[in-house]
Amino acid sequence: MASTKTTTTTDLTPEERYDLITSNLQEVLKPNIIKSVLAENRPLKVYWGTAPTGRPHCGYFVPMVKLAHFLRAGCEVTVLLADIHAFLDNLKAPLELVTHRAKYYELVIKSVLRAIGVPIEKLRFVLGSSYQQGAAYVMDLFRLSSIVTEHDAKKAGAEVVKQVASPLLSGLIYPLMQALDEEHLGVDAQFGGVDQRKIFTLAAENLPGIGFKERAHLMNPMVPGLAGGKMSASDPNSKIDLLDGEEVVRSKLRKSHCAPGEVEGNGVISFVEYVLFPIAELADEKGEGKFVVPRDEKWGGPVTYSSAAELKKDYKEDKLSPMDLKRGVEEALNKLLDPIRKDYEQDEEFKKVAELAYPAEVKVKKKKEKKIGTGYVPKDKKTTAEKVTDGVIKPQEAVEVAVGTSAKDAQDKLARTAE
């Protein structure tokens, strides 16, 4: 992909920098904190954290675009590879794998940013365990835990931490650590998905209680998955992996939920709106994004859209079919993924780390259990039905009965035996 626009920080006023920082976001908490930092003419320090659990998918393009905006606005950006968080989240990443997954995430994120033309030299990557096991951090965790209730901690992580029937204590520690990261990374703002809102609120309400300043919080919308609902790394039917091949991308898109005329909850349209258009804007000198649908001539020929609103209007009015929309997304997405796939194929370290981070599952063949009671039982081991005596169940020894040659003889002998 072509490099991004050449607008520099010095070309932007504080107001323009604020508009760029907050563009395409769903919500901003405490925007005045951001404005006051920009008014001081100093760079806004912001961090985005990601827990290295499942393989990163195409939904990661959404925060990557915002990182590009932050950098262009002159922000100092930190990417937190939250390895301890990955372990705390109901053991989504076992300890023996989490280090490899953190490295894999770093390689993938850098490749994605290069693919959309973002200079990565100004990014700072930090591994959570590099400071979260220190004495000062642990003591701050104790202090924070002394003022946050179990109810509030559980509520904060409800949309982020995996919910199970018997919640683990680790799920309550998770949101407290995410709040503390703001202080220990020395930032002015934290960025994340809107699903992080309750954790952001917990941080804003409780950090001042242990003597730390309140931060601003920036939230991007959550892109619906291909099957509807949230795009998730744990649901293979909801997402396209960043290293999926062209045929896999085509297959997943063709199977995706994309009802004619329906815009709300349509994962394919949302992907165009929140990924393809913003990336196209990054690459254009004038910041104007375009999305091309390669339609057959008999259906009107190729059509170019300059905005998501324009595309949605045509889709609602059935001027754009689901199949044509999917073809356009397939073509644009494969162009985005090509340099990422090439990075992987040409980098032996990348391949090795991927193997270590996500080892192939070994299927263990289950042994058939021997059915009890079907084998031969020696004569001296035979027992009759169990007999209850004084509340204690005792097996009776088997009694052999010669039943004779007639029904009358058998009944008489059985009656005598029972006496």
Regions found by a protein language model. Give the residues of each.
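An acidic- and aromatic-residue-enriched active-site/binding cleft used to recognize and process polar
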Residues: 51, 82-84, 128-130, 194-196, ...
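Divalent metal-coordination and catalytic microenvironments
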Residues: 57, 109, 228
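Short secondary-structure boundary/capping segments
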Residues: 63, 93-97, 142, 235, ...
